């Protein structure tokens, strides 16, 4: 699996370099779920596909920007699912964005998830790699990823990152969010899931939520590319996840590779509070 991780690092570095002079315009294409693709979405996906295709340990890749699974080597063991550029719609305002990767063994399912990674393209290039414990790495002047620290969640945080159009929230979710603000939580929502999860991890706690809404009853975030890998990282850091019913997002099973789900990630206190509010 270390070989797979090393190729992901190469792809991340190439995307980071390309971001220095990006084309932020939209293409004429849409991805499987109907999102209009930025030209840089397509470029990033191409960089990752090209790089991972050189790794003999990868059986197949699944991209948010591809309709189907792409088989690379049927004799290999690992399947890599990825969002090539999470938060790409924020490129024109120069917000921090990132790439998300999940490494599955033999079959793409939460129970077969062996490692998860994400990169942050911000003021500096950082990479979080998680097998047993999330570890933060930072690119140095020699183009090497240097270990910075292990990432751990506190039992309770102060950050509230909540998505979904408010007018479409269910009443129970609106009440829950209000209760957090009543406790003094700070709103920290950028519109890039990877950036918001990264802030919660590095600050040690809080909650990220993207609930079921009237216009998206199954949520909008994709299980295999976004939800499972970030849930894996949060839980390995000592945090909790749920879809509002299950006690872990990693308990969920889906047949379709572009399946979506409501999702909540956070410290133990916030997730316990949410489950109580949702199931009263």
From Swiss-Prot:
Alphabetical list of PANTHER family matching this protein: FRUCTOSE-1,6-BISPHOSPHATASE-RELATED (PTHR11556), SEDOHEPTULOSE-1,7-BISPHOSPHATASE, CHLOROPLASTIC (PTHR11556:SF35)
Listed name of the protein? Fructose-1,6-bisphosphatase class 1
A GO BP entry is:
fructose 1,6-bisphosphate metabolic process
Report the cofactors: Mg(2+)
Task: Name the NCBIfam families for this protein.
Answer: PRK09293.2-3
Localization: Cytoplasm
Gene3D superfamilies, from UniProt? 3.40.190.80, Fructose-1,6-Bisphosphatase, subunit A, domain 1
- Which InterPro entries does the record match to this protein? FBPase_C_dom, FBPase_class-1, FBPase_N, FBPtase, SBPase
Q: Name one GO molecular function term.
A: fructose 1,6-bisphosphate 1-phosphatase activity
Q: Where does substrate bind?
A: 86-89, 189, 220
Pathway connected to this protein: Carbohydrate biosynthesis; gluconeogenesis
Q: How does it assemble?
A: Homotetramer.
The residues listed in the UniProt record as binding Mg(2+) 1, with positions renumbered to this chain, are 64, 83, 85
Q: Which reaction does it catalyse?
A: beta-D-fructose 1,6-bisphosphate + H2O = beta-D-fructose 6-phosphate + phosphate
Q: Which family does it belong to?
A: Belongs to the FBPase class 1 family.
Which HAMAP family does this chain map to? FBPase_class1 (MF_01855)
Pfam families given in the database record: FBPase, FBPase_C
Query: Which residues does the record give as Mg(2+) 2 binding sites?
Result: 83, 86, 226
Name which cysteines form disulfide bonds: none
EC annotation from Swiss-Prot or TrEMBL:
3.1.3.11
Enzyme class (EC, first level):
hydrolase
Q: Which UniProt keywords apply?
A: Carbohydrate metabolism, Cytoplasm, Hydrolase, Magnesium, Metal-binding
Give the GO cellular component terms, alphabetically: cytosol
The record's cofactor note says: Binds 2 magnesium ions per subunit.
